[in-house]
């Protein structure tokens, strides 16, 4: 399987509010930047969409090292998702999982790949994390303008 390194980030102005996500994919000497956003969303949804969009962009099975500064994503995928799935996508106190649509999409995106998850401290000088943050802010800016116009 092809090795890929992914760095992701999400951003939101207000929570909820306009938001953006960004991802950098590196494979060999090739690098690809992805970004997007929504007019009305949350930071956690943007963090999830960054990881989902990056994984869905891969066209064949890969071994992935995915770096995120989101404890929500890291804990969700590393600890919580297994119980959610076993409990029919309900939390331990029987409430529906927040952002279940995105967690299910992330779960599906993982099936083709071997993914190792890494947490990095945000805004701490990690070059790729800073670049992913800028892409997320670019996506946010585009959708902040849309929410003001539309």
UniProtKB/Swiss-Prot annotation:
Q: What does this protein do?
A: Endonuclease that specifically degrades the RNA of RNA-DNA hybrids.
Query: What family is this?
Result: Belongs to the RNase H family.
Q: Where does Mg(2+) 2 bind?
A: 9, 133
GO BP terms: namely: DNA replication, removal of RNA primer
Location in or out of the cell: Cytoplasm
Does this UniProt record's set of keywords contain Hydrolase? Answer: yes
**InterPro entries, per the entry:** RNase_H, RNaseH-like_sf, RNaseH_domain, RNaseH_sf, RNaseHI
Provide the reaction this enzyme catalyses: Endonucleolytic cleavage to 5'-phosphomonoester
- Cofactor stoichiometry and binding? Binds 1 Mg(2+) ion per subunit. May bind a second metal ion at a regulatory site, or after substrate binding.
Report the GO molecular function annotations. Answer: magnesium ion binding; nucleic acid binding; RNA-DNA hybrid ribonuclease activity
Q: What is this protein called?
A: Ribonuclease H
Q: Where is it predominantly found?
A: cytoplasm
Note the subunit structure.
Monomer.
- Give the PROSITE patterns listed for this entry: RNASE_H_1
Q: What is the lineage of its organism?
A: Bacteria, Pseudomonadati, Pseudomonadota, Alphaproteobacteria, Hyphomicrobiales
Its domain of life? Bacteria
Q: Could you say which residues bind Mg(2+) 1 here?
A: 9, 47, 69
Q: Where is the RNase H type-1 domain?
A: 1-141
Name the keywords, alphabetized: Cytoplasm, Endonuclease, Hydrolase, Magnesium, Metal-binding, Nuclease
Q: What is its EC number?
A: 3.1.26.4
Q: Which GO terms describe its cellular component?
A: cytoplasm
Q: Per its Swiss-Prot or TrEMBL entry, what cofactor is needed?
A: Mg(2+)
